UniProtKB/Swiss-Prot annotation:
Keywords assigned: Neuropeptide, Secreted
UniProt-recorded name of the protein: Extended FMRFamide-2
A biological process from GO: neuropeptide signaling pathway
Entry GO terms, CC: extracellular region
Family named by the database record: Belongs to the FARP (FMRF amide related peptide) family.
Function: FMRFamides and FMRFamide-like peptides are neuropeptides.
Lineage: Eukaryota, Metazoa, Ecdysozoa, Arthropoda, Hexapoda
Subcellular location: Secreted
Entry keyword annotation includes Secreted: yes
Keyword Secreted tagged: yes
Primary residence: secreted
Organism per entry: Mantophasma kudubergense
Amino acid sequence: ADYLQLARA
């Protein structure tokens, strides 16, 4: 999973 993307959700 892309945690950098999830953190901005």
